[in-house]
Amino acid sequence: MPFRLTPQMKQRLTRRARDMIERSLQLFPELQGTIITVGYTRKHLGSATIVYRKGIAMRLIIRLKVRKLTYQTIGHELTHLIQGWAHGDRSRSRAADPAKVPSGETQCDIWTLARDPLFCDDPPTYIKMPRVVREHWPDYAAQVRKLCIAAIEKRHTHRLYIRWLEDELHKIAKIERPKIFQADQLLLPFVI
């Protein structure tokens, strides 16, 4: 999927960041056939904007902080584009179509995590969760993603699905932390 870089981003974009953006865009089929402008920001982790003229989306823009860039941030900003695009038609109610991603930061985090495990590399910013879950995110990421998927399913019948999700997150924090096997750094024997 093609994307355009702003002059500031051209100066700062690393190979790693370019690869991350390209890989993330592949997981957003809703954005196929559009050109996304990728800009640079210093203030926030990221931001997303849709420029409309006479009710037509003219430009889709995301701005990212290249330093400490995560898939979660890229996915979050791309999900904002989907939110804005879905709600661009102001003639109908925003809640009219349950298949659309609802507007809001917390909703954006939920839909981003549910989209693909790739976006679980860093804890979300807006979902309220216990400190232990945030601090030991790699141990909890898969469980949180499953809960986000369940929360989206619950949304059709349960109006307070975000509260349900946050309650479930508090429950998993009380259970002993799951141990995810990760290869430790290779230790070489010290020989004198």
Language-model features: where?
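Catalytic zinc-binding patch centered on the HExxH motif and its immediate surroundings
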Residues: 26, 32-59
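Post-HEXXH active-site segment of zinc metalloproteases
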Residues: 72, 84-118, 127
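Long, well-structured alpha-helical subdomains associated
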Residues: 118-192
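Short active-site segment of divalent metal-dependent hydrolases/proteases
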Residues: 75-83
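Zn2+-dependent metallopeptidase catalytic core
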Residues: 12-32
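Short pre-active-site segment immediately N-terminal to the catalytic Zn-binding motif
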Residues: 58-74, 98-100
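Acidic/histidine-rich, surface-exposed loop or edge segments in extracytoplasmic proteins
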Residues: 2-7
